[in-house]
Amino acid sequence: MKPTEIITADAKRNGVNPAPILNKLGRLLNNKEAIMLQSGNSVLIVQKIGKGIAELHLYTADNQMGLVRALREFIKKIRSSGLDAVYGNADNPQIIEMVKALGVNVIDSDLPGYNWKATYPFKE
């Protein structure tokens, strides 16, 4: 699937209109304010929000096994990125549990507007 198809499928599955999401992401990507990673039928948007920190948004159309593979790849790329911490809002607590099971230190966020934080070093 193309990234726009993945994001659209994820938004619709969650009862959200995909148009505003796609418009905002297009602007962020065009302005080089964010990067997009894709693995299988999952997309991760990484938006720098400060020195050494970024905000993450995950969109997926993968089944559980495909999502685990994608998360492994995304974690590997984040480990090599030089980021100290990443933040996000998880609508699905199962995804946070998957990330923890893959060895990432995930804690409650210390920044307003986010409900989780993962810190460096992202454990091997």
Identify what each model region corresponds to:
Residues 112-124:
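C-terminal "cap" of GNAT-fold acetyltransferases
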Residues 1-8, 36-38, 90, 95-99, ...:
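A structural boundary/capping signal
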Residues 2, 45, 82, 86, ...:
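Long, contiguous secondary-structure blocks with strong helical propensity
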Residues 51-103, 110-112:
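Acyl-donor binding region in acyl/amide transferases
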Residues 29-64, 121:
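Conserved donor-binding loop and adjoining core beta-sheet/short helix segment
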Residues 24-28:
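N-terminal low-complexity, intrinsically disordered segments
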Residues 1-23:
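Short amphipathic alpha-helix that is part of the acyltransferase structural core
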